């Protein structure tokens, strides 16, 4: 009997699987979200970072000395692989303007009489400035300037000592009695593709898995086929859900395994662990993500609402995975909430295997938690069945809407219709409330700590001396670092690192103090994990600062080892002072750099969603014989486009004031731009986004499908904008793609205006408005051709070489070009 029941259950499971496979192959949407988008995501993350190195970053040099020494410094800067000297300035103001315009990312100032002051030891100074509103670039430039100019700083004393017959090694030991040897583990080149490609592929992938799972189940209830689905499963909800999701699980698992082979194979991301174990954890992660989607949908199975919630959950997972900003540095409620996301546990397990070659014993808790998501979904399935039966009963007594004639078209009627459609649609109101207000507040709150503080470090002190204890005490006192514990065993410290308890290891050798006492250079070793670049950056900065303090305190003790002429060299010369200034992000915080870009993406993404959802609803209404608006002439088309654009524009003016005006004040995000300039920038951005959305929305045949496509790209917009990684270092095809979407250029433009303090007057000299090109929207109905036009391809603020002369002419040409392109657009609408 049991065998017979099992046979019936397996037969029902096979029937549900075949039914779902037929549904998947009957709509191009499923091919796109199950195959095309994941493969595109894999290609995107595998190629977006180019060679992964921050090299050839454009910088400038302001040489006000014009001597042999200053030219030698310029050659030294040009020879550094991080820099690409694109321009030599004769005025610091010109260099600052170039930095504001993003022609360069930093510049070095060599002041007048530098050589004379360096030779005479009268306070020679070198100052460098770097664009810290772009954190990744700013950090690289700061480190490169410090490393390149370090020999220059000591050169006056070294040259004077060598001229008096003292060896360079002897004077170098006196100047730097303690030196650091820093070893970034696993990723010694600090390659961004190694750091970000693997985790962010799965971050994007989990958004797609969540949305596809909810849509596949929710579409059964939406299109009235839930009864047939449950009946085919013989009334067993477990069979119904398992059969429906199994085809997606197999496809997503195949793509996840393929991604592992691509990332650790052709992309050459180092991986010494078990690929079989990594693939097994990947499949478990995919199933756990599907289980989370089932759980969320079962709580309240209204696809119009829940798919919006799930899109926000998926996007929040990108932040709470802890890849870029460590979750441990966030507020306690955010840290606790991160464990509600499967991607967080998968990231912990994957990084343990990738970075530390850890075995299963080190991340079994993460694997166990992924199984808990599956258990939670199984326990809530009876509730989902109850909802389905309730929906079937309501369908039986509900009356289908009767067709109604389209309303007379006028601009005022289009505006009234659009306002009414937005105000009476709970799903769209949820997107606006959640995407604009909740999302904006949450992102600011999550990144409110802004800086990574007290990164734990293990100390292996084999010296047990007064000097080593002083160094440890000073290191623990820095804001970036906290001493987790001390151990005499380096292997125990490595165990702490594998377990994720510490982010680095400080190794003080047995002769740490003895070498200083003998007049020799003493070296301490810092081993730092690179699974979070911000942790590594904090450890590196804190150890370097403590090293400088210790050197200053103990340098005079080394005078007994110098010959008289060495003392004369030290007394008669002085080192060059090297100072750096971070511009446009005075807090040097991660949130201060990322949040402005995220706010622009929120505006762009939610507007696309709202317009596409409304257009999808109209497509659903047309299939039911309800035609709300019909364009029979060019004038009608212009009324529809103009009326709709007016509604979206006015709505998002208010939202922009909240996101770009109120939130920066509430969360102390640096901003020095003019409100008028930002308004001027937002006008073409909002218009361009509206036109783009009207053009692409015709491809969506229901109101939920847009969220599958649009929400998926939320993280990609940030990368493509050039804020996280310099646009100049990306492959040419991604540089071109940057201009296809208004969000990319608008992100850069907003940062230039708001954080760099430029004005639109100077921006127009560099900005070329391509205008608005026409796009034709054709309805798919066989009995009617809808000639309403979607205007797309926002004149993408193409950045061209700066025009520093004839600024007023440039502004006039910019406006004339914009007007001409608008007239051309109107002529093309046919």
Go through each PLM region and give its residues.
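Extracytoplasmic/periplasmic domains immediately adjacent to an N-terminal transmembrane anchor
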Residues: 2-193, 395-592, 801, 814, ...
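Hydrophobic alpha-helical transmembrane segments of multi-pass membrane transport proteins
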Residues: 40-43, 183-263, 441, 581-664
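Alpha-helical membrane-protein architecture signal
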Residues: 10, 14-18, 194, 233-234, ...
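Hydrophobic alpha-helical segments typical of transmembrane helices
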Residues: 69-73, 213, 225, 349, ...
């Amino acid at each position: 009997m049991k065998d017979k029941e099992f046979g019936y259950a397996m037969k029902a499971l096979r029937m549900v699987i075949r039914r779902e496979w037929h549904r998947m192959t009957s709509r191009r949407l499923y091919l796109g979200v199950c195959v095309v988008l994941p493969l595109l995501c894999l290609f995107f993350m595998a190629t977006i970072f180019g060679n992964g190195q921050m090299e050839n970053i454009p910088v400038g040099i302001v040489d006000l000395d014009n001597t042999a020494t200053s030219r030698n410094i310029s050659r030294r800067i040009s020879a550094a692989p991080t820099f690409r000297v694109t321009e030599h300035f004769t005025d610091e103001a010109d260099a600052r303007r170039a930095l504001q315009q993003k022609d360069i990312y930093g510049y070095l100032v060599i002041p007048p009489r530098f050589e004379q002051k360096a030779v005479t030891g009268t306070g020679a100074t070198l100052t460098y400035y770097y664009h810290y509103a772009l954190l990744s670039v700013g950090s690289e430039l700061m480190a490169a300037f410090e490393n390149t100019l370090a020999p220059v700083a000591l050169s006056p004393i070294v040259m004077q000592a060598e001229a008096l017959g003292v060896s360079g090694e002897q004077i170098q030991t006196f100047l730097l009695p303690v030196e650091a040897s820093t070893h970034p583990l696993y990723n010694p080149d600090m390659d961004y593709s190694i750091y970000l490609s693997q985790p962010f592929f799965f971050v994007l992938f989990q958004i797609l898995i969540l949305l596809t799972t909810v849509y596949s189940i929710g579409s059964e209830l939406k299109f009235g086929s839930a009864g047939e689905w449950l009946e085919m499963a013989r009334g067993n909800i477990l069979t119904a859900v398992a059969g429906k999701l199994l085809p997606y699980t197999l496809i997503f698992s195949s793509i996840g395994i393929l991604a592992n082979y691509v990332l650790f194979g052709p992309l050459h991301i180092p991986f010494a662990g078990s690929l079989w174990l990594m693939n097994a954890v990947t499949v478990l992660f995919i199933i756990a993500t599907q289980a989370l989607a089932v759980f969320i949908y079962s709580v309240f199975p209204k696809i119009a609402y829940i798919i919006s919630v799930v899109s926000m959950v998926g996007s929040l997972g990108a932040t709470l995975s802890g890849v870029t900003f460590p979750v441990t540095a966030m507020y306690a409620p955010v840290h606790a909430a991160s464990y509600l996301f499967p991607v967080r546990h998968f990231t912990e397990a994957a990084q343990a295997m990738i970075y530390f070659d850890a075995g299963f014993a080190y991340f079994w808790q993460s694997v166990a938690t992924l199984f808990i998501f599956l258990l939670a979904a199984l326990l809530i399935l009876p509730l989902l069945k109850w909802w389905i039966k309730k929906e079937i009963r309501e369908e039986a007594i509900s009356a289908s809407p009767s067709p109604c004639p389209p309303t007379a078209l006028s601009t005022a009627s289009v505006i009234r219709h659009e306002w009414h459609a937005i105000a009476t649609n709970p799903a769209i109101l949820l997107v606006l409330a959640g995407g604009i207000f909740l999302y904006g507040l949450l992102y600011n709150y999550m990144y409110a700590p802004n800086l990574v503080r007290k990164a734990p470090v293990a100390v292996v002190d084999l010296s047990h001396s007064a000097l080593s204890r002083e160094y440890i005490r000073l290191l623990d006192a820095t804001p970036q670092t906290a001493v987790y514990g001390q151990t005499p065993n380096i292997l125990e410290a490595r165990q702490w690192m594998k377990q994720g308890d510490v982010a680095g290891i400080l190794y003080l050798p047995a002769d740490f103090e003895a070498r200083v006492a003998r007049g020799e250079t003493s070296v301490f070793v810092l081993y730092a994990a690179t699974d979070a670049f911000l942790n590594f950056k904090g450890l590196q900065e804190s150890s370097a600062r403590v090293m400088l303090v210790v050197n200053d305190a103990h340098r005079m003790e080394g005078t007994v080892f110098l010959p008289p002429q060495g003392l004369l060299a030290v007394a008669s010369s002085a080192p060059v002072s090297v100072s750096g200034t971070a511009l446009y992000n005075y807090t040097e915080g991660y949130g201060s750099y990322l949040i402005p870009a995220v706010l622009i993406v929120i505006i762009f993404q939610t507007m696309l969603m709202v317009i596409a959802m409304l257009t999808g609803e109209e497509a659903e209404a047309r299939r039911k014989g309800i035609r709300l608006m019909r364009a029979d002439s060019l004038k009608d088309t212009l009324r529809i486009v103009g009326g709709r654009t007016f509604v979206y524009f006015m709505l998002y003016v208010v939202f922009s004031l909240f996101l770009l005006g109120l939130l920066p004040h509430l969360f102390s995000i640096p901003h020095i731009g003019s409100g008028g300039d930002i308004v001027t920038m937002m006008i073409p951005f909002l218009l361009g986004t509206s036109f783009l959305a009207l053009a692409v929305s015709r491809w969506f045949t229901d109101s939920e499908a847009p969220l599958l496509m649009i929400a998926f790209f939320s993280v990609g917009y940030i990368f493509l904008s050039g804020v996280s990684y310099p646009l100049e270092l990306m492959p040419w095809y991604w540089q071109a793609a940057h201009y296809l979407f208004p969000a990319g250029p608008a992100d850069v433009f907003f940062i230039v205006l708001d954080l760099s303090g430029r004005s639109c007057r100077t921006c127009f000299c560099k900005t070329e408005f391509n205008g608005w090109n026409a796009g034709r929207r054709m309805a798919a109905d066989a009995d009617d051709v809808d000639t309403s036009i979607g205007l797309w391809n926002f004149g993408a603020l193409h950045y061209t070489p700066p025009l520093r002369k004839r600024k007023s002419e440039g502004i006039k040409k910019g406006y004339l070009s914009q007007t001409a392109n608008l007239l051309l657009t109107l002529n093309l609408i046919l």
